[in-house]
């Protein structure tokens, strides 16, 4: 895949300029990403409609932001591009019952995550362009960076190209979000979906949370104070992740002590070894062949019994009780919560 700089491609710049004045975009959903997309695109000169259930919790918020709010079916009827920015598990029903009967012929259907299309939960009409545009950051960050004249990198993909302009539409949309100010990378629905799920399951969410819990349990079972264990395996994780974020693993190693570096080199591979990688491959295989998605759909349709059980077990883990007590004394956290509503995974919560 290649990085794309649309600012250096005159034909794409011309397409974007000409499209702004004519393209009507319907944003379906007004959560973290939906609101950021709608505001940024409007500020970039596009005509925006927001599609929401009448009387829903976000309708008043969208209206307060100055948007025309219509029901999703009406918004789809009037739009040239329909951006589906709702949670994954409601998209199939939304598309089949609301969007498919109403979206006009030749319009563009846009997703911010490829799960439903990649696993054929949604089969878009053949008379539509179908694209993906995903900012690599939470909605609050997408909006904040745009407002100060910068942008969050975006990835994009094309699934169907009826008009022969689907790629340019995706790039135009990404540019309207501010992505062209940073970086835009071409991908596929398959690559975006499978890597996104793998990252969440094996590293960012599943991997890290299980590692932290295991580290906490190891220290407490060895007789160390739970409070000290919490600080060492969870609280200080932010310091390390911030360094990762700024400059990768090598930057982190530059800023920790030589003792910590040596411990990294000799003990890290004892915890995360070749067998870990083999289990990661098994997780990836379940994602690639659709096993995970099949199980997730069955779980959702059954009313989430196991999901609720897993969630309750996490809530009851001793690290949560200790953490709650310690965080109550961290007065700076309250001010951070007040001033910053950004959560890294909220890019999925729309």
From Swiss-Prot:
Pathway: Amino-acid biosynthesis; L-isoleucine biosynthesis; L-isoleucine from 2-oxobutanoate: step 2/4; Amino-acid biosynthesis; L-valine biosynthesis; L-valine from pyruvate: step 2/4. Its EC number is 1.1.1.86. GO terms for molecular function: ketol-acid reductoisomerase activity; magnesium ion binding; NADP binding. NADP(+) binds at residues 30-33, 53, 58, 88-91, 139. GO terms for cellular component: cytosol. Pfam families: KARI_C, KARI_N. GO terms for biological process: isoleucine biosynthetic process; L-valine biosynthetic process. Belongs to the ketol-acid reductoisomerase family. NCBIfam families: ilvC, PRK05479.1. This is Ketol-acid reductoisomerase (NADP(+)). It comes from Xylella fastidiosa (strain Temecula1 / ATCC 700964).
